[in-house]
Regions:
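Hydrophobic alpha-helical segments, chiefly the membrane-spanning helices
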Residues: 1-325
Length: 325
């Protein structure tokens, strides 16, 4: 079992490193073709930081492991909200720029309501569900880019009429490292999936539980890094805004893409009080934790230490119920 643990960790490292390389290279390419910093941040960076979750969920769904695909997406949202955001709030409560929260929060609750209703009513995530989620993703991205364009100043746009040989070399380098980043993410995702499954068998734990906890935590490490960096620099509002955006993309992009490519049934490999824990634990915790995070931020323009403490308690209970009940 030790070898599977080590390979699981190697997979996480490859995922995270590959994601970093992909984002850096994508930003370099986008700048070369004259995109503004705002649009790069709203599209390239936000998508790039979600690639680890996307590769794991899509890869799992295509290989017939819908439990891991579901658990990774839902578990990442819970981890982002009730652990990473909660720690940020608990350590340094702060005032919040509501503009960073409002649009992604609205889109999140609309898309998650559709996601949850599909699960409760049909017990499956169909291709139709995936297409609707991807449509919401496209609408959100269009809205974000359109909004960003309104804020572009001329000094943020790279002039394209003076391309030098060194810039062409840099472009080639960015394209090469972009490919390397994708390869690392793909390798890491495969290692994570394969060894996550083997660990679940070895420990006698359902695959959904492994995905909701260990895999979800691993693929959320980029958000944790961003949160810590933002806290150190005193940008708590930006950190929470990034987390809300990441949660939205986990629903509309990660889940939407994986379900569209390979529909799967709602996991039913773990029961709680004789009922499917996906319906009475996972998805309710996902919605409740986001409500606890967003309502005070949207209504008061501030987050409080007690919020962080309560969310951390929720995450602790959630993990306890996954492993010990």
């Amino acid at each position: 079992m030790l070898i599977h643990v080590l390979l699981f960790i190697v997979g996480l490292i490859l995922l995270i490193k590959g994601g970093d390389i992909f984002v850096d290279s994508s930003v370099g390419i986008a700048r070369r073709f004259g995109l503004s910093e705002l649009i790069i941040g709203a599209t390239v960076v936000s998508l790039g930081t979600t690639l680890p979750e996307a590769f794991v969920s899509v890869g799992s769904a295509l290989r017939g492991y819908g439990e891991i695909s579901y658990g990774n997406a839902v578990g990442s949202i819970i981890c982002n909200t009730a652990l990473i955001a909660a720690l940020s709030i608990f350590i340094r409560p702060s005032e919040i720029d509501r503009k960073l929260f409002k649009i992604p929060a609205i889109f999140f609750f609309i898309s998650s309501a559709f996601y949850v209703i599909s699960a409760y009513c049909f017990g499956t995530f169909s291709r139709f569900t995936g297409f609707i989620l991807l449509l919401l993703f496209l609408i959100y991205m269009f809205f974000t880019v359109f909004k960003s364009k309104d804020s572009i100043s001329s000094d943020l746009v790279l002039k394209k009429d003076s391309v030098t040989g060194s810039e062409n070399i840099l472009l080639f380098k960015n394209i090469l490292t972009l490919v390397i980043g994708v390869v690392l993410i793909s390798l890491g995702a495969n290692l994570l999936i394969d060894n996550g499954i083997k660990l679940s068998y070895a420990l006698g734990i359902p695959e959904t539980v492994i995905a909701l906890t260990f895999i979800a935590f691993g693929t959320s490490l980029p958000e944790l890094t961003t949160a810590v960096t933002s806290l150190i620099k005193g940008h708590g509002s930006l950190s929470l805004g990034n987390i809300i955006g990441a949660n939205l993309l986990n629903i509309v992009f990660v889940s939407g893409l994986s379900v569209s490519l390979s529909p799967f049934d709602l996991p039913s490999d773990k029961l709680l009080l004789g009922m499917n824990s996906s319906l009475i634990l996972d998805m309710p915790i996902m919605i409740i934790s986001m409500l606890l995070l967003c309502i005070p931020a949207l209504m008061k323009g501030k987050v409080y230490r007690i919020q962080g403490a309560f969310l951390l308690m929720i995450y602790t209970v959630f993990c306890f119920l996954q492993f010990f009940i």
